[in-house]
Amino acid sequence: MGSTTLLKESGPREVFCGLTSIVWLHRRMPDAFFLVVGSRTCAHLIQSAAGVMIFAEPRFGTAILEERDLAGLADAHEELDRVVNDLLARRPEIRTLFLVGSCPSEVIKLDLARVAERLNGQLQGGVRVLNYSGSGIETTFTQGEDGALKAMVPLMPNSNEAQLLLVGTMANAVEDRLKHLFERLGIPSVSSLPPRQSTDLPSVGPGTRVLLTQPYLTDTARELKDRGAEILQAPFPLGAEGSRLWMEAAAQAFGINGSHVATILEPLMVRAQKALSPYKEQLAGKRIFLMPESQLEIPLARFLHRECGMELVEVGVPYLNRDMMQSELELLPPNTQVMEGQHVEKQLDRVREQRPDLVVCGMGLANPLEAEEIATKWSIELIFSPIHGIDQAADLAELFARPLHRRDLLNNQLLVSV
C-alpha cells in the first residue's frame, strides 16, 4: 500500500442512478416490493434497466411525483398513503415494502422515514415498510444496495451463536457453491444478507463474523459492527486469488487448520488457473484504464494485473474506504495510480493521451470512446454477471477479453475493406 500512489480529484462526474440496484434486489427477494417515489424518468429507467414489461407485474413500481407535488400544491404524504394501500390490496403476497427515495423526492424533502414509520403503525406487522435512498445525487449506482441492506440490519434478531454472514447480493448458484465450500472447510453455520426471502433475516451478534462480497457496502458494514459483528479483513472474492484469500480469512477466524483449507481449495485453484490460461494469453501486456463508477475498480485491477497480466494505466474509484480496501491496495503493483473522485473531462483527456487498450467505464462514455477507436467495457455489466468465487475467475476474465476481441475483428474488417 505504501508504494501505491493515492490521488484525489473533484469536478464534473459521469454517474449512473442508484435506483438501478432495485433490478438485482427485487430478483433476490421475491416477497419484497420496491416502490420508487420519483418522477416518470425514474419509472422509465427502472423498467428499461430491468427489461421487464410493466404488464408482467414486476416486484417494483413508481409512485410518480407530479408537478403539483413538486410545487408543494398537493399533499404528497396523503397521495403516497393511497398508492401504498392500493398496492398492498392488489398484491397481498408482499411481505416487505421498500420505499425508495429518488432525486425528486429528496429535492422536495419528502421524509420517507416518517412515512415508513406511519405505515408500519397502520399495517401492524402484516407488511414491514422500510425506506432508503436510491438517489444518484451524491452516490454511485451500486450504493442503492448498501442503503437497502442497511435498512434491514435493525430488524435482524440478536444471537451470540458463532456463525459466518455473507453480506452482499450474489447469483444464487454462486452463493450455493460458496456455502458448500464453507461447509467443507468446517464452517457449518453460514447465512446471507440479503436473504432469499425478505422476512427470513439472519441473526447477528458478537459471535457473527462478516465477509463482505461487495466493496460498496460501507454503511451496512458499519451497522453490523454496531450490532457486535466482526468484519473480516480480506480481499474481495473476485478472481481465483482474491476468492481464496477471502475464504482463508473466514477459515482463520474460525480456527480451521491451514492444511485442511489447502486440501479443499488447491484443486479448485489448479482448475481455475487452467481455465484462465486462454484469456490470460489475450489479456497479458494489454493496458487498461478503469474509470470510477461501480466501486469494484480496485478489486478488478488487482485481478486483472496479478492473474491476467494486464498493465494498470489508472485505477479510478468514486470513493475510497482505506480500511475496507487495505487488503486490496496491498496487492496492487508498485506505483499504481489510484484516483479517488472524478473530474470526467480531465480523466477523458488522460485516456486520450495514454490510449489504453481497454477502458472500463459507464455506458454514457462508452460509445464516444468506441468512436475514437478505444475499446470499452461497461462497468454495470460486471454487477449483473456471476463473477464471484474461484470457479468464476475465467468467466470474469472473459468479460474483459471479449471487447478486445471485438475490436480486433473490427480492425481486421477495416483492413480488408481498404
Swiss-Prot record:
Cofactor: [4Fe-4S] cluster
Binding note for cofactor: Binds 1 [4Fe-4S] cluster per heterodimer. The cluster is bound at the heterodimer interface by residues from both subunits.
Annotated [4Fe-4S] cluster binding sites: 17, 42, 103
E.C. number(s) listed in UniProt: 1.3.7.7
Keyword field: 4Fe-4S, ATP-binding, Chlorophyll biosynthesis, Iron, Iron-sulfur, Metal-binding, Nucleotide-binding, Oxidoreductase, Photosynthesis
The reaction(s) this protein catalyses: chlorophyllide a + oxidized 2[4Fe-4S]-[ferredoxin] + 2 ADP + 2 phosphate = protochlorophyllide a + reduced 2[4Fe-4S]-[ferredoxin] + 2 ATP + 2 H2O
Protein's UniProt keywords contain Transmembrane helix: no
A GO biological-process term: light-independent chlorophyll biosynthetic process
GO molecular function: 4 iron, 4 sulfur cluster binding; ATP binding; metal ion binding; oxidoreductase activity, acting on iron-sulfur proteins as donors; oxidoreductase activity, acting on the CH-CH group of donors, iron-sulfur protein as acceptor
Pfam families: Oxidored_nitro
Principal EC category: oxidoreductase
Top-level division of the source organism's lineage: Bacteria
Pathway: Porphyrin-containing compound metabolism; chlorophyll biosynthesis (light-independent)
SUPFAM superfamilies: Helical backbone' metal receptor
InterPro entries (alphabetical): LIPOR_BchN/ChlN, Nase/OxRdtase_comp1, Protochl_reductN
Keyword field contains Repeat: no
UniProt-listed PANTHER family: LIGHT-INDEPENDENT PROTOCHLOROPHYLLIDE REDUCTASE SUBUNIT N
Complexes and interactors: Protochlorophyllide reductase is composed of three subunits; ChlL, ChlN and ChlB. Forms a heterotetramer of two ChlB and two ChlN subunits.
Similarity section: Belongs to the BchN/ChlN family.
UniProt function note: Component of the dark-operative protochlorophyllide reductase (DPOR) that uses Mg-ATP and reduced ferredoxin to reduce ring D of protochlorophyllide (Pchlide) to form chlorophyllide a (Chlide). This reaction is light-independent. The NB-protein (ChlN-ChlB) is the catalytic component of the complex.
Protein's name according to its UniProt entry: Light-independent protochlorophyllide reductase subunit N
Organism: Prochlorococcus marinus (strain MIT 9303)
Organism taxonomic ancestry: Bacteria, Bacillati, Cyanobacteriota, Cyanophyceae, Synechococcales
